[in-house]
UniProtKB/Swiss-Prot annotation:
Assembly with partners or alone: Homotetramer.
Taxonomic lineage: Bacteria, Pseudomonadati, Pseudomonadota, Gammaproteobacteria, Pasteurellales
Catalyzed chemical reaction(s): carboxy-S-adenosyl-L-methionine + 5-hydroxyuridine(34) in tRNA = 5-carboxymethoxyuridine(34) in tRNA + S-adenosyl-L-homocysteine + H(+)
Function: Catalyzes carboxymethyl transfer from carboxy-S-adenosyl-L-methionine (Cx-SAM) to 5-hydroxyuridine (ho5U) to form 5-carboxymethoxyuridine (cmo5U) at position 34 in tRNAs.
Protein name: tRNA U34 carboxymethyltransferase
Family, similarity comment: Belongs to the class I-like SAM-binding methyltransferase superfamily. CmoB family.
Binding site for carboxy-S-adenosyl-L-methionine: K90, W104, K109, G129, D151, P152, T153, I180, E181, M195, Y199, R314
Keywords associated with the record: Transferase, tRNA processing
A GO MF term: transferase activity, transferring alkyl or aryl (other than methyl) groups
Biological processes annotated in GO: tRNA wobble uridine modification
This enzyme's EC code(s): 2.5.1.-
């Protein structure tokens, strides 16, 4: 099982120390309710070899390598273990010559977001809904002091720990398997990311308030979410599914989203990027057995989802507390 005690020790002397009032008990409770496959997944992490990378690049990729390459047999054993943690959704990773080609080219999103951010050097960062942690490693690559990701999905935790093991057990990033609604208001993070989460929330304004409660005064929110075309009064509430997803509740226009952020007290709210999701950014690979974007769009008109809604378009909004 994954040991969270090193993280407790890490934060004990930082401005995250108040979290120790609640977090250890929450994770003890979490351990009693884990997914039936969690024990198997965590053992796969244990089965991965302890390799030392001579070269790690988190600035332009998430990559580890060594001077003397692995043998083909060693590579195949690692691939075998990693493929038992499928589906791999967010990546890509390049680990000792193994290309983990995930469903999402999350480097595309990072390249859209990064130029607009306040410098991450020396910052304490929270990544809400972090998935398996790809963007967390890129934040470390930008010089972040500490990156904490939260995501309740046990598979993502085990994928993250597998990647960490192949990055020389780097402890500058940590994934905690909780949702933001379970976090006490810490007001301790310099930057808070919420990317690809808001539209899954039944109460989006509550989510925005929860993000605000984790920021230091003046800290930066990075919000990336689905949007639709329209004015300040435009919000899509899908009747049933959106792009085959059942858990999509509110998709606002950019203007409506800015209004929501201002309503909960954020300042300096601005949209810095809007991009339609392409078939190059989200697609099927050998590391994903499920359907992908091509299956979610109208086969005759890729400007629409299979349900007839506007195809996925994503905005990046920055704001300050």
């Amino acid at each position: 099982m994954i040991d969270f005690r090193p993280f407790y020790q890490q934060i004990a002397t930082t401005n995250l120390s108040d979290w120790l009032e609640t977090l250890p008990l929450q994770l003890k409770e979490w351990e009693t309710q884990t997914h039936g496959d969690y024990a198997k997944w965590s053992k796969i992490v244990d089965f991965l070899p302890d390799l030392h990378a001579d070269e790690i690049d988190l600035k332009s990729a998430v990559k580890s390598d060594r001077t003397f390459p692995l043998s083909e047999g060693e590579k195949q054993r690692i691939i075998h273990h990693l493929k038992q943690l499928m589906p791999w959704r967010k990546g890509p990773y390049h680990l000792f010559g193994i290309h983990v080609d995930c469903e999402w080219r999350s480097d595309f999103k990072w390249d859209r977001v990064l130029p607009h951010l306040a410098p991450l050097q020396g910052r304490t960062i929270l990544d809400v809904g972090c998935g398996s942690g790809y963007h967390m490693w890129r934040m470390v690559g930008e010089g972040a002091k500490m990156v904490v990701g939260i995501d309740p999905t046990e598979l993502f935790l085990c994928q993250f720990e597998a990647v960490r093991k192949l990055l020389n057990n780097d402890r500058r990033a940590n994934l905690i398997p909780l949702g933001i609604e379970q976090m006490q208001p810490l007001a301790a993070f310099d930057t808070v990311f919420s990317m690809g989460v808001l539209y899954h929330r039944k109460s989006p304004l509550d989510h925005l308030s929860q993000l605000k409660n984790q920021l230091v005064k003046g800290g930066e929110l990075v919000l990336e979410t689905l949007v639709v075309d329209g004015d300040v009064n435009t919000v899509l509430i899908p009747a049933d599914r959106y792009a085959k997803m059942k858990n999509v509740y509110f998709i606002p226009s950019v203007a409506a989203l800015i209004n929501w952020l201002e309503k909960v007290g954020f300042t300096n709210v601005r949209c810095v990027d809007v991009a339609t999701t392409t078939l190059e950014e989200q697609r099927k690979t050998d590391w994903l057995e499920n359907e992908s974007l091509i299956d979610f769009l109208d086969s005759n008109d890729h400007s629409k989802t299979i349900e007839g809604y506007q195809a996925p378009k994503r905005a990046v909004i920055l704001a300050n507390k």
